[in-house]
Amino acid sequence: GTQTNAPWGLARLIS
Protein backbone atom coordinates (compact mmCIF):
# COMPACT_ATOMS: atom_id res chain seq x y z
CA GLY A 1 0.00 0.00 0.00
CA THR A 2 2.64 2.49 -0.98
CA GLN A 3 1.66 3.67 -4.46
CA THR A 4 -2.08 3.14 -3.92
CA ASN A 5 -4.78 5.62 -2.98
CA ALA A 6 -6.58 3.02 -0.88
CA PRO A 7 -7.52 3.91 2.73
CA TRP A 8 -5.31 1.12 4.12
CA GLY A 9 -2.44 2.35 1.98
CA LEU A 10 -2.72 5.86 3.35
CA ALA A 11 -3.02 4.51 6.89
CA ARG A 12 0.23 2.61 6.36
CA LEU A 13 2.00 5.74 5.16
CA ILE A 14 0.67 7.86 8.03
CA SER A 15 1.20 5.18 10.66
Curated annotation (Swiss-Prot):
Q: Biological process GO annotation list?
A: proteolysis
Q: Does the keyword Hydrolase apply?
A: yes
List localization entries: Secreted
Q: How pH affects activity?
A: Optimum pH is 9. Activity is relatively stable between pH 8-10 but drops at lower pH and is absent at pH 4.
Q: Which UniProt keywords apply?
A: Hydrolase, Protease, Secreted, Serine protease
State which Enzyme Commission number(s) the record gives. 3.4.21.-
**Lineage: superkingdom:** Eukaryota
Q: How is its activity regulated?
A: Inhibited by serine protease inhibitors phenylmethanesulphonylfluoride (PMSF) and di-iodopropylfluorophosphate (DFP).
Which segments does the entry list as coiled coil? none
Q: Which Gene Ontology terms cover its molecular function?
A: serine-type peptidase activity
- Which family does the record claim for this protein? Belongs to the peptidase S8 family.
What this protein is reported to do is described as:
Protease capable of hydrolyzing gelatin and cell surface heparan sulfate proteoglycans (HSPGs) in vitro.
Official protein name in the record: Alkaline serine protease
